């Protein structure tokens, strides 16, 4: 199906990026399969991860056992673990968007260090408002400087200890993957 979507996109002459979004409830085998398909088909990136159906035992309140997707802080640890695994499996060759439980600069930095090129906010943005974006941006700049990085790109995947060959992104390539495929 992905190959056909890419063909249709390419036939239209409108190079809209195609990203695959995955849930944190994947098994290791499913994660491996999806990463391999993403690399083979040439998707433009992955969004890791979506809401979870799991309910951690520490949830409190009247909605603790509510059916449906769970998002926000309880999703941070499993989604960050899946992000790190996806980064390892794709060997840094696909841009990854880290999602799930990000509510601070420290959370965003953890996602970046696990392999995210970008981060996505939702739940925390709803509760904290648009000022949260500036707080995270400022805090992230401080964390990067503290650790000797001059850009987010330098910190991507650093927790993995992987030495990948990265190519600097040019403005004309903004919608294309930043890593060499091969």
Put a short name on every predicted segment.
Residues 18-22, 46-48, 95-100, 119-121, ...:
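Hydrophobic faces of well-ordered beta-strands that scaffold small-molecule active sites
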Residues 56-72, 125-149:
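C-terminal helical cap(s) of enzyme catalytic domains, especially alpha/beta-barrels
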